[in-house]
Swiss-Prot record:
Name of the featured protein: Acetylcholine receptor subunit beta
GO biological process: acetylcholine receptor signaling pathway; chemical synaptic transmission; membrane depolarization; monoatomic ion transmembrane transport
Similarity section: Belongs to the ligand-gated ion channel (TC 1.A.9) family. Acetylcholine receptor (TC 1.A.9.1) subfamily. Beta-1/CHRNB1 sub-subfamily.
Keywords: Cell membrane, Disulfide bond, Glycoprotein, Ion channel, Ion transport, Ligand-gated ion channel, Membrane, Postsynaptic cell membrane, Receptor, Signal, Synapse, Transmembrane, Transmembrane helix, Transport
Residue intervals annotated with topology Extracellular: 21-235
Record membrane topology: Multi-pass membrane protein
Length: 489
């Protein structure tokens, strides 16, 4: 008995479904009767077809600075009215919508005019949705590669205004007019729509503006487009970690070149190593930035600034080494060099030279030596210095040395010596002269080395000052490069 009751119910449902299919088939036959997809859905030839153009942004895939192009994944939203596709739902079983292949109905052929790959087709030809009043909505997805003029001045602390221009490829403004879509409250939607649940964030860029505007040309009344302005700002963390921080560390190495003693022999090696490393970084960046002469990226400016400083560090190191290895045999030290680099600058550069030797103690008054002078006697002049005395005895001379000194430094103009002492005195005077010359040589050579150390320290502080001020000025300038309040140019 239960089976006998179920069969009529099943047959009734099948009959209703068959009738519904028949109604939809009848509706399709009705709307496509005498339908021509090549004819605009206008009642009169001079009537313009109003097409609403909107866009849902799904993903900013990439921005190629080298090729100056923006790759995005979007859903283009188009809506218009085609009275030829209207029907009365009551006559067709209450059907409120109809899905039709886009190839079977008229479409406004809206395309991305500034595409960069020559592909004007959509990624997928989805069906259009038709309402009983003839309203047609179409949301085809697309992977667009649009041209984007890259402003490289503040790269990588930059923002870019990449526009996407949509217009009808074959129809002018007198046949098809483009307008912004409207929301449920009837208000125009003048920006690209983003659904947070489906939008994919980009790891390198963040969207700041996504407004749209209808543009027309006063010189061409048939021109009309809807342009979406995507203002995107770069996230510079990658470049800070991989480029800027290494450059700063290399600059610090170049600073320590001036702290390295010239005798170490590695000043030039370290300077040239830093210069070559910065050159490699510059070559790596050359593959990233666009080949344009309209501007120089700020990161390239910083690299050039750093390379200039490192180049000067090489030059300054050569100067320091040249000063360090000078000697009295090759160079004479001018008085102004002594005054500036030995007596004046060191106290301002935090350099203190070891204390000089303590001066000799004052000797007691010389003894009076009297003797009888003859015409044929040998006379010698009083020595002008005491360098014939041993150096260790300068401060504590023994009595014999003092007696000899008093004997030689008597008040008389000359002393009569026996002939057997003439050769001994001559040898002593020769030794004293040689010791004096050697001490003068060593003193002047040490003065040149001290001048080299002072110049090295001067270059160190100068390099630190220029590096700090230059780095701060460059990156503070980039810090003020903020996206505009309005995206429209």
């Amino acid at each position: 008995n239960s089976g006998a009751l179920l069969w009529p119910l099943i047959w009734g449902l099948l009959l209703i479904g068959t009738q519904a299919l028949d109604k939809e088939a009848q509706l399709r036959d009705k709307v496509f009767e005498n339908y021509n997809i090549n004819v605009r859905p206008a009642r009169t030839p001079d009537q313009r077809v109003v097409v609403q153009v909107g866009m849902t942004l799904a993903h900013v895939i990439s921005v190629s600075e080298k090729d100056e192009e923006l790759k995005t994944k979007v859903y283009l939203e188009m809506a218009w009215n085609d009275q030829r596709l209207s029907w009365d739902p009551k006559q067709y079983g209450g059907i409120e919508s109809l899905r039709i292949s886009s190839s079977q109905v008229w479409t406004p052929d809206i395309v991305l005019m500034n595409n960069n790959d020559g592909n004007f087709n959509f990624a997928l030809q989805v069906d259009v949705l038709v309402s009983p009043n003839g309203n047609v909505t179409w949301h085809p997805p697309g992977l667009y590669v649009s041209s984007c003029s890259i402003e490289v001045q503040y790269y990588p602390f930059d923002w870019q205004n990449c526009s996407m221009v949509f217009r009808s490829y074959t129809y002018g403004a007198d046949e098809v007019t483009l307008v912004h879509p409207k929301d449920a409250n009837g208000k125009e939607v003048t920006q690209a729509v983003i659904f947070p649940n489906t939008f994919e964030e980009n790891g390198q860029w963040v969207i700041r503006h996504r407004s749209s505007r209808k543009n027309s040309s006063p010189n061409d009344p048939l021109y009309e487009d809807i342009t979406f302005y995507l203002v995107i700002q770069r996230k510079p963390l990658f470049y800070i970690v991989n480029v800027i921080v290494p450059c700063i560390l290399i600059t610090i190495l170049a600073i320590f070149v001036f702290y390295l003693p010239p005798d170490a022999g590695e000043k030039m090696t370290l300077s040239i190593f830093a210069l070559l490393t910065l050159t490699v970084f510059l070559l790596l960046l050359a593959d990233k930035v666009p080949e344009t002469s309209l501007g120089v990226p700020i990161i390239v400016n910083y690299l050039i600034f750093t390379m200039t400083l490192v180049t000067f560090s090489v030059i300054f190191s050569v100067v320091v080494l040249n000063l360090h290895h000078r000697s009295p045999n090759t160079h004479h030290m001018p008085q102004w060099v002594k005054q500036i680099f030995i007596h004046y600058l060191p106290k301002y550069l935090c350099i203190r030279r070891p204390k000089p030797e303590t001066p000799l103690p004052v000797a007691p008054p010389p003894r009076q030596v009297t003797s009888t002078r003859h015409a044929d006697e040998y006379f010698i002049r009083r020595p002008e210095n005491d360098f014939f005395l041993p150096k260790q005895e300068r401060y504590h001379a023994d009595p014999f040395s003092r007696d000899m000194k008093w004997f030689l430094e008597g008040p008389s103009l000359g002393l009569v010596l026996p002939r057997d002492l003439q050769s001994a005195v001559t040898a002593i005077r020769y030794l004293a002269q040689q010791l004096q010359e050697q001490e003068d040589y060593d003193t002047l050579k040490e003065d040149w080395q001290y001048v080299a150390m002072v110049v090295d320290r001067l270059f160190l502080w100068t390099f630190i000052a220029f590096t700090s001020l230059g780095t701060l000025s460059i990156f503070l300038d980039a810090n003020f490069n903020l996206p505009p309040d309005t995206p429209f140019p």
